[in-house]
Structures are given as C-alpha cells and as structure tokens.
Regions:
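Extreme N-terminal starter segment of soluble prokaryotic enzymes
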Residues: 1-2
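Acetyl-CoA-dependent GNAT
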Residues: 6-10, 17-88, 92-94, 105-107, ...
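Short hydrophobic/aromatic beta-strand or adjacent loop that forms the aromatic wall/cage
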Residues: 45, 152-156
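Active-site beta-strand termini and strand-to-loop segments that position acidic
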Residues: 51-53, 158-161
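Active-site acidic-Proline motif in GNAT/NAT acetyltransferases
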Residues: 92-94, 98, 127
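Conserved GNAT acetyl-CoA-binding A-motif
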Residues: 112-124
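Conserved beta-strand-loop-alpha-helix junction that forms the acyl-donor binding cleft
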Residues: 122-132, 148-153
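Conserved active-site tyrosine of GNAT-family acetyltransferases
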Residues: 135, 140
Length: 161
C-alpha cells in the first residue's frame, strides 16, 4: 500500500539512510542528511515521502527559507513568506511513471498554500527535458531564472498557487 505524507522524524532518517546507501562513497549525502534534518527541525523546510508497505520509495522537500543551501539566498526561489522551492524530488526507478510524485507534489502544494505560500518554484537541469516537460505540465510555467550549478545549467520555473 502506498502512502503520501509529511515525513516523520523516523521516516526522514530512513529516507536519508536509504539515499546514503544508494550513494556509497559519496560523503556529500551524509552532509545533506544532517542539513535537511536540521531544516525540517527548525522550520526552514518540510520533507514529504511516498512509502510502500512502510518503506520510503520517494520524497520531495519544500524549502521555505532563503538560507537553505539549495536556495543560496535567492529570494526569487524561496523567501520565507510567500514563495517556496520544491526540491529533491526522487522516486525509486521501479515506481517511476506511476503518478506517485504527481500525487506527492499536490500534497506539498496544498501544504504550502495552507501556510500562506502563494508561489512555488522548481528547478531542473536544462538537459533533463523529460523533467522540464513534467514540471510545465504541472503548471510550473513562469520562467524565473537560470544559473550554473555543479557544471550544469539549471532552469527555474514558478507556479502560482
């Protein structure tokens, strides 16, 4: 059975332990675990999960604060008042195409709206045409900015809630 919900502290740990295990040898994932757990604890972000039979299989995080490292102070991406950033959308390969991330994003958008956010931004590498197409289909169709990140061109779009 699939569940789509806010990540509890235990589920948040399980998600990050899974991510770290899938990226053995890449120490950055351990740093991100600490960072995102801290963001969830202090209200700078909220992580949501897709679970299957109690195990995490997908995730996404809403970043509210411009101080989150992925936002890097760019107020057009997240400003802590009316604009949040949708970050780190992931789903296990075996569940891709099943609509699970779409369902999770709808829950995340409602969560943001209920807390006064009226705009959500999302970014994708320019070469990820499939993801860009999906985001446009979801209504993220107002171009916000672009920048180079880790050697890739990332395009950011916004959706008004």
């Amino acid at each position: 059975m699939f569940r789509y919900e806010e990540a509890s502290p235990d589920m948040l740990n399980a998600v990050w332990d899974k991510n770290i295990a899938e990226h053995t040898g890449d120490e950055q994932w351990k740093h991100w675990k600490e960072e995102y757990i801290s963001y969830n604890s202090n209200g700078s972000a909220k992580t949501f999960t897709v679970s299957y039979d109690g195990s995490p299989v997908g995730e996404g995080t809403l970043l509210f604060s411009p101080q989150c490292s992925a936002v890097r102070g760019r107020l057009e991406l997240a400003n802590g008042t009316d604009t949040a950033n949708l970050n780190a959308l992931r789903i296990d390969k075996r569940f891709e195409g099943g609509g699970h991330i779409s369902k999770l994003v709808k829950i995340m958008e409602k969560y943001a709206f209920d807390r006064g956010f009226r705009h959500i931004t999302i970014g994708a590498e320019a070469r990820e045409t499939r993801n860009l197409s999906i985001y446009l289909h979801w209504g993220y169709n107002r171009f916000v900015t672009s920048c180079g990140e880790e050697g890739a061109l990332v395009l950011y779009y916004q959706k008004d809630l």
